[in-house]
Structure formats: C-alpha cells, structure tokens
C-alpha cells in the first residue's frame, strides 16, 4: 500500500504530544523535542519569518498574573503591608 488516500485510515499512532513548556501538542515523542518552542533547548524557538506567530505567543496575550500588577506596585516603590495615610483632614482628625 502506498502513502496516499487509502493508507490514511491505518494511521493511528501519535507522533506529537503535549509540551510541558509551551503547552501545545508539538512535542515529538521519538525525537524528544518540541517543534513549537524547541524544548528541552534552553532558548525558546522564534523566527522573524513568522511575525504573526510571535504576536500570538508574546507577553500580554495570556493572564499575566504577576506582570499586570507591577505598574501599580511601582508607584509606591513596591511597599507592602503599610497603612495608607488618609487623604482628607476630616478623616484624619476623627481617627
């Protein structure tokens, strides 16, 4: 049997599984390498010929649990656990 239409029904093994770094189904099982982010290599795989792909995966497209709070915390020089001073005099005199 050739590799054309008739043989596609016989394909049942997965060559790629989920990658632990990027989460995509791009980790090649036999090669042990991710085709999307190049895990386990230290440097993440990006190419400028795929600008749209970089735009999809860049910082700001996800939740940014930590990073979205940094500008607000920067205003107070990253102080934490202190009591805020009252803004108006009436609240300051009553307490």
UniProtKB/Swiss-Prot annotation:
<keyword id="KW-0862">Zinc</keyword>
<dbReference type="GO" id="GO:0008270">
    <property type="term" value="F:zinc ion binding"/>
</dbReference>
<dbReference type="GO" id="GO:0019843">
    <property type="term" value="F:rRNA binding"/>
</dbReference>
<keyword id="KW-0699">rRNA-binding</keyword>
<dbReference type="GO" id="GO:0022625">
    <property type="term" value="C:cytosolic large ribosomal subunit"/>
</dbReference>
<dbReference type="InterPro" id="IPR001569">
    <property type="entry name" value="Ribosomal_eL37"/>
</dbReference>
<dbReference type="GO" id="GO:0003729">
    <property type="term" value="F:mRNA binding"/>
</dbReference>
<feature type="binding site">
    <location>
        <position position="37"/>
    </location>
    <ligand>
        <name>Zn(2+)</name>
    </ligand>
</feature>
<keyword id="KW-0863">Zinc-finger</keyword>
<dbReference type="InterPro" id="IPR018267">
    <property type="entry name" value="Ribosomal_eL37_CS"/>
</dbReference>
<keyword id="KW-0687">Ribonucleoprotein</keyword>
<feature type="binding site">
    <location>
        <position position="22"/>
    </location>
    <ligand>
        <name>Zn(2+)</name>
    </ligand>
</feature>
<keyword id="KW-0479">Metal-binding</keyword>
<keyword id="KW-0694">RNA-binding</keyword>
<dbReference type="GO" id="GO:0003735">
    <property type="term" value="F:structural constituent of ribosome"/>
</dbReference>
<dbReference type="InterPro" id="IPR011331">
    <property type="entry name" value="Ribosomal_eL37/eL43"/>
</dbReference>
<keyword id="KW-0689">Ribosomal protein</keyword>
<feature type="binding site">
    <location>
        <position position="34"/>
    </location>
    <ligand>
        <name>Zn(2+)</name>
    </ligand>
</feature>
<dbReference type="GO" id="GO:0005576">
    <property type="term" value="C:extracellular region"/>
</dbReference>
<comment type="similarity">
    <text>Belongs to the eukaryotic ribosomal protein eL37 family.</text>
</comment>
<dbReference type="GO" id="GO:0006412">
    <property type="term" value="P:translation"/>
</dbReference>
<dbReference type="InterPro" id="IPR011332">
    <property type="entry name" value="Ribosomal_zn-bd"/>
</dbReference>
<comment type="function">
    <text>Binds to the 23S rRNA.</text>
</comment>
<dbReference type="Pfam" id="PF01907">
    <property type="entry name" value="Ribosomal_L37e"/>
</dbReference>
<feature type="binding site">
    <location>
        <position position="19"/>
    </location>
    <ligand>
        <name>Zn(2+)</name>
    </ligand>
</feature>
<feature type="zinc finger region" description="C4-type">
    <location>
        <begin position="19"/>
        <end position="37"/>
    </location>
</feature>
<protein>
    <recommendedName>
        <fullName>Large ribosomal subunit protein eL37z</fullName>
    </recommendedName>
</protein>
